[in-house]
Amino acid sequence: MKKLVLCGALLLAVAGSAFAQSPQKPGKWNVKMQMEIPGMPFKMPPINVDVCLTEEDLKDPQKSVPSDPKSKCTVNDYKVDGNTVTWSMECPKDKTKGNGEITFTDETYTGWMKMQVGEQEMTTKYTGTWKGECTKK
């Protein structure tokens, strides 16, 4: 279960920031994420967070995916086709791999990611809404 929660955090990071040279624009984004895990005795609650992305965050998918450095996750097969971004990723230490797709409009995005964590599969659906410029705290 701990791996699934950590994986969920990684998925959120990917949805929020792993889009180098993508149509996503910098600023404050509200990200909603719903994980579906077959065989779980309960439904995972949706996650809703705000993420602030800079121009620098959007340049390198490898640097923009926050994860445990010990996991040594890599983003592979990263492609931008018009307003759609696709990718695959792998975290060998955690035996995690997956792929996903996100399609952007000017101020929204929708997408999905499928992950294999050991023997467990999960699908995450995303929606994102641009909320404006980031504010300093």
Feature locations, PLM:
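Short amphipathic alpha-helical "recognition" segments used for binding
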Residues: 6-7, 52
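Positively charged n-region of N-terminal signal peptides that target proteins for export
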Residues: 1-4
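Subset-of-secretome marker
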Residues: 21-137
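Sec/Tat signal peptide C-region and signal peptidase I cleavage site
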Residues: 16-20
